[in-house]
Amino acid sequence: TKTIPNATLGAFCEENHVALMHTSRGVLDGLTFATKDVFHIAGSRTGFGNPDWIRTHSAEKTTAPVVKSLLDAGADMLGRTLTDELAYSLSGENFHYGTPINSAAPDRIPGGSSNGSAAAVSGQVVDFALGTDCGGSVRLPAIYCGIMGIRPTHNRITTDGVIPFAPSFDVIGWFASDATIFEEVGSVLLDQPAMSLDVKRLIIAKDTFPLVDSSVNEVLKPIIKSLVDKFELTKEINVSQDRLAHWFEIFRTIQGSEIWANRKQWIKEFHPVFGPGIRERLEWASTIDSQTISWAHSEYVEINNYLTNLLEPDEILCLPTSPRVAPLRGTETNTLEILYRTQAMNLLCIAGLGGLPQISLPRVTQGGLPLGLSFIGAPGSEMNLLALAVNLVYQPSF
């Protein structure tokens, strides 16, 4: 099909638009999805959010296995969705292609880098959408757009046929606004049946809440209280020993060094044009020296080991997804960088450093703006987290 779905939303790619019909029947029969423009589709060029990228790359020979799995399960792909440039942003404002409309808060940004996928689900154009998450590129747009998002365990779902970003942290994720669909997509991509919820203990990450804006905390506190009442066994822990800012520094150093290692050849050869924010981040990434990288790696090994062993399979860690509601469209780049990106990544880096699965579930502020509450599980506990989503979203107290 040549038609771009709901073009006024600005969520879909036009230059390399492609739609695919289901290849078989299965649990996703009759459902529609969209795919972030980092997944390869045979016979089509992947755009990666930058016109110079698409211009300097040829059509792909194979389709990413995750896309094939969804088509095999009966879902139809309606199109590719916009991404931030080289996926190196959490804002969702693309200098070249514009900003998709956030249907949950139209005067605010959708978040990124899986901006088009989140906007397509929030705008009810598709039932679910594929994204990728490294530093928060599914979890943050999910809450800005008032929908559900998941980052699975690192290496749990193949990233073959997906443009690499920072492989130490890259995962495939997805969005949905319906909890049952959210879970069904998980069953297909994780190749595991749905399970009944198994939570013995809810753990509150108490060091994360002081980072959160008062208007967000005001909504989250009563929800936390109702969760504490629901799960009899709860405890509070200082998950980072008050070192979240340090953890973020480790995360961004490794992430930046891997992005630069992956992209420097192409940048030096083609001198692509980058928009504000992306350009500065890439310039900074190019300056990270080998000594800093090895320091970050040795710290990372220690943090990763601690986080991997932090939770039992039947324990869930609860924390805010982001410190603030989505900023207004057109917010100045420096404000975005300091108040939104850096502060959000202090929270988002926890699951990344641990390679842990995390879901974000939507709530709203007193003024009706979307925000989110997150749950992190032990490695491989995605189906339990998805069961939690199903269990909670249909409860009046949540």
Language-model segments: which ranges?
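Structural helix-boundary/capping segments
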Residues: 1-6, 11, 128, 134-210, ...
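General beta-strand structural signal in soluble alpha/beta enzymes
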Residues: 35, 77-82, 130-132, 236-237, ...
